[in-house]
Amino acid sequence: MFFTDQNEPSEKTGYLNEAFRLFHLRDQASREFSWHYHDFHKVVIFLSGKATYHIEGRSYPLKPWDILLVDRHAIHRPEIDSSVPYERFILWIQNDLPYQELLSCFQKARDRSYNLIRLSSGLQEKLKEILFQLEDSARTQAFGQDILTQALFQEFMVYLNRIFLEKQYIYDKKSYSYDSQIASLLQYINHNLQADLSVEKLASRYYVSKYH
């Protein structure tokens, strides 16, 4: 199954058995998301609503058709204003793809500490076209569905990597804010997953309220 219109699971890591899975979601539920991470990579394509995505100490207020690259194990959470409908595509991607170069953009996002792709209208239309074709193919049961869906997924990821690796996106320092204390805390958690990570211990180490 490549496609689902059911809600994206909110467990700490989630589960993905196939190479990738595409979600197209629209809801207006009042939900609080805790900090979490996944064992797979994630692409978020924001379509409409009011949302801010927090990833490893950086906060990105989103505009329609903004794209976020969330590397596996990156600690993140969305902050959603439920006063308006929230619509997005979510793409989950396994780490053991046959073509590993398609995952280069996630490592580069981590290296740059920058996860946002904001596109010019021309590049935006190109990715929209591929994405909608991918959605249509993933939904159908027609002849060759698996082959075409895989090909469209690879095409989408090739263009996404070209855009991000070659910095063809629109960069604006005002497109995000940075919390150095939260970033330091999350980095500590990432590197000490076997240590005592209780709320009390972390609050004491970083001098923050455990209710923060």
Predicted regions and their residues:
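Generic protein-terminus/edge-of-domain signal
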Residues: M1-I67, A74, S82, Y99-D111, ...
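Basic/polar phosphate-binding segments, predominantly the helix-turn-helix DNA-binding elements
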Residues: Y159, Y188-H212
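N-terminal positioning helix adjacent to the helix-turn-helix/winged-helix DNA-binding module
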Residues: L123-K126, K174-L185
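Linker/hinge segments immediately adjacent to helix-turn-helix/homeobox DNA-binding domains
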Residues: M157-I170
